């Protein structure tokens, strides 16, 4: 009998999609279906919040933050 997995359709930038694909290669926890080459994925509904938190942490580390003014 077929099993159904609840999924959520997400649209993201190609760079973010590449990060999600990398995560999924490690453990196959996130992606139900890769729909196209650019922006669309179906993500397991149960893993959506976990994925958002993990992406947030990684992007915070990689995005350059403007330095505070030294004149203050």
Swiss-Prot record:
TM annotation in the entry: none
Gene3D superfamilies the UniProt entry points to: TFB5-like (3.30.70.1220)
Key words, A-Z: DNA damage, DNA repair, Nucleus, Transcription, Transcription regulation
Biological role: Component of the general transcription and DNA repair factor IIH (TFIIH) core complex, which is involved in general and transcription-coupled nucleotide excision repair (NER) of damaged DNA and, when complexed to TFIIK, in RNA transcription by RNA polymerase II. In NER, TFIIH acts by opening DNA around the lesion to allow the excision of the damaged oligonucleotide and its replacement by a new DNA fragment. In transcription, TFIIH has an essential role in transcription initiation.
Family per record: Belongs to the TFB5 family.
Assembly and oligomerization: Component of the 7-subunit TFIIH core complex composed of XPB/ssl2, XPD/rad3, ssl1, tfb1, tfb2, tfb4 and tfb5, which is active in NER. The core complex associates with the 3-subunit CTD-kinase module TFIIK composed of ccl1, kin28 and tfb3 to form the 10-subunit holoenzyme (holo-TFIIH) active in transcription.
Name of this protein: General transcription and DNA repair factor IIH subunit tfb5
Organism: Aspergillus fumigatus (strain ATCC MYA-4609 / CBS 101355 / FGSC A1100 / Af293) (Neosartorya fumigata)
Classification of source organism: Eukaryota, Fungi, Dikarya, Ascomycota, Pezizomycotina
